[in-house]
Amino acid sequence: MATGWQPECLVTQNQSSLGPVEAHSDRALQNTTGNVQSYSDHLTHADIAAREDQLHQLGFKYPHAPHHPQPLSASGLDQQHVAARLHQRKLRRLHSVGPNSQSRRARSSYLKSQKYLEYRRRPRRDTGKDGEPVWSDELEDAFQQALEANPPMGRRKWSERGKSYGRNELIAEYIFKLTGKRRTRKQVSSHLQVLDSFLKGDPDWERLVREASPERSSSVHGSAPAPKWRTAVEHTSASSHYGSHTHGSYHDHMRSMQPYAGDLPPPHYTLGSNMQEAAASTIHGFNFDMWVTAPQQANRIGKALHTYTRLQGDLHHSAASSMPLEHVNGWRSSFPQLASMVDDINNPMDCDIILLEVNLELMTDFPPARSQLGIQLDLDFGHPSAGDVFGVSQMDNWTCSTHIYEDGQKLIESHDDLPKTQSTKVKPLFESSWWAKMFTKVTQDKRMAEDSGNPQVAREADDNTRNFFRSLSAVQELRATSPSSHRLSNQYQGHHGDESKRMAVLVWKFRQTRPGQVGTTTWRRLIPAPDRTSNNSPLAVSGIDLPPLSLDSILLNKASHQGMYQTPQPHDLIPHPSQSHSQWSLYHPPHDNVANLFNPSGHLDFLASISKAEDTINDKIAVTSVLDSFSTSLAPESIPSTSLHGPSGAPVMLNVHDLPLSHPGIGYAMGHEASHYVPSHQHSVNMHDSNGVLHSFFGSNMQPLDDLSHSHASWGAHSTSIPGDVGAGSYHLSYHPEHHGHGPVSRESQQPHHFDSLLPSEDLMDKIVGRMSNGASMHGAGPDAAGYDNSTVDSV
């Protein structure tokens, strides 16, 4: 027995096949695949219809020598009957593409209209950055197909990975996918406007450029149509996307129909559409085997000395159903390369992702010397019925990149060029040299553990081997280049030369079988999460209508925060050098005297006394007058206030300017609800803080009261009632010649004011007062008025 594998006997996967298997038994089996016969057997036992389809395929392959099939069972039919049968077959083929394809083609009648043909005959003057006309015939055809594939969406957006796309952006992307030439959103919009000037009013054109009314669209379509170049349906519906035996759209395509000049090609030939992109990269056949052959034996799995694993189930149908990628436990850590592909927003996953779960049955001993390891990996992109519809056999520059990981850590990375295939089958390489060395090492470790004679060591070696295979994973990426990409790769600016297309991604998971089990491999398709969802644009945020604030809440919010008066700021207060600053006390808004402001009739009663006991205000620095809580024209001054004596025990209230009158001894205390001025308790007169009341006295544009000196305003009336005030509860001011211990305080500066001009002369005031009646009809100012003192007062 050999102690290792012979390196020169390792079978490489890229050996060329020089003949049949029987003549060259030393060749690798993967070059003489065992499923060649299975691909051709269906022609031998096919019925007449299948043979006719084969003839149609030959006619499509060689268009210069068309061959119309002759029915084998109806040789005596006349030519008219044959034409009728061909017409019926043509209709069936049209219906096999889709329910709306024929009607969609018929609705594009504006392409044959005189106006559109006139536009197409115009010379192309504009040249793009790629040096070609902005809308050449090729781009014009792609543009028309993009209009069909991306229906009008109005102001809605098509969202993908956090980015929104409008219809014009989708059309530009569609054109790029179809032709490889970039056209911007603005170019698409401008082209739509130009065509609209020619075709406006045409029903077919209006259908493509105008969104249907909400009533019609909701009743006919039910929901907004989705763009066809990238939709979430291709990821969420595994049966429609991957079902290899249910693809009715690929069976019996229109082989005998050719697109004619001036019209669009059939919709199902649009390689940029969602259906065709998915179909071009869909794998319809798969095979994987790994075996060892003894020396001098035919290098095929039928003559294998030992089979590590082989495919379970049919070559064309997976034994396991499709599964969402997110359901694979730890797929990001197991397949780092796949995670980077999925997260790449610039290169979305538009190909098949195949998961292969490989169970390996290891050898119990070393193979004979000069044994060969065979690995066969085949992927078939051809449909079993339609064959190579999309020209996969014409693609070249096939490459395969392989990444093998252990616990997510990269063990090996390789990039191989594959030979150009002449069929729809591709044979990727799978690192046979690395696998041969790995199998040799695993077998050697197992033999050493068994030779030790210690069962515990043998069990530990077996567990280590199982854990090693369980931690193994691999990712393979297949890419190829279509022939048209060579012509279009460098014809627009900004292209970096990577015109290859990702054709398939294979991800591998491994495990070791239990004793007595056979190594098998199963494959299934993985469905990545959808990366496009249709969302409407959010509506503009409208303003929130808040209820209006009441006057009480405005006064409270303006005067204080949480019941505390703020310390006067420097710009609000100019202190006198001889005055001392004291902190404002807490103000507790009372609730027991609010009702006293209203008389039984529901109106404000300015004559009703507030029964709240007042405190003494001792020589505080006066701030702006509270006569007008909203006024900003009251200039701050440093004015010492008089002392108003009252019962102690209640919190100290606001310091305010005293009202400088020409008669000493009239001290005023402030009612602390709604800013009322209240005289001493022996006088029952309230002065309400109201802009309307003050303006009725002095006018709206007069100088503030703070700036008036006590020697410039003479109150020359026994009792005064101002007409037009607040009604029956008129605003009164009573005067009593008595002193409270403190005379009026003089202001520091006495400047002339214009207050004298507001009042008539003293003689005229005497005459007016003398003529006034003391009756009760003077708006409550007579002797019977509430709160009025009948004592005689000398006029000033």
UniProtKB/Swiss-Prot annotation:
Residues 128-202 bind DNA. Keywords: Activator, Conidiation, Nucleus, Sporulation, Transcription, Transcription regulation. Residues 84-95 have a biased composition (Basic residues). Pfam families: TEA. The keyword Chloroplast does not apply. Disruption phenotype: completely abolishes conidia formation and leads to the formation of compact white colonies. Produces extremely elongated and immature phialides with defective morphology. Residues 115-132 have a biased composition (Basic and acidic residues). GO terms for cellular component: nucleus; transcription regulator complex. InterPro entries: TEA/ATTS_dom (IPR000818), TEA/ATTS_sf (IPR038096), TEC1_TEAD_TF (IPR050937). GO terms for biological process: conidium formation; sporulation resulting in formation of a cellular spore. Residues 235-247 have a biased composition (Low complexity). GO terms for molecular function: DNA-binding transcription factor activity, RNA polymerase II-specific; RNA polymerase II cis-regulatory region sequence-specific DNA binding. It is found in: Nucleus. Residues 61-135, 210-261, 446-465, 728-757, 775-796 are annotated as: Disordered. SMART domains: TEA. Belongs to the TEC1 family. BrlA, abaA and wetA are pivotal regulators of conidiophore development and conidium maturation. They act individually and together to regulate their own expression and that of numerous other sporulation-specific genes. Binds to the sequence 5'-CATTCY-3', where Y is a pyrimidine, making both major- and minor-groove contacts. Plays an essential role in the differentiation and functionality of phialides. This is Conidiophore development regulator abaA. It comes from Penicillium digitatum (strain PHI26 / CECT 20796). The lineage of its organism: Eukaryota, Fungi, Dikarya, Ascomycota, Pezizomycotina.
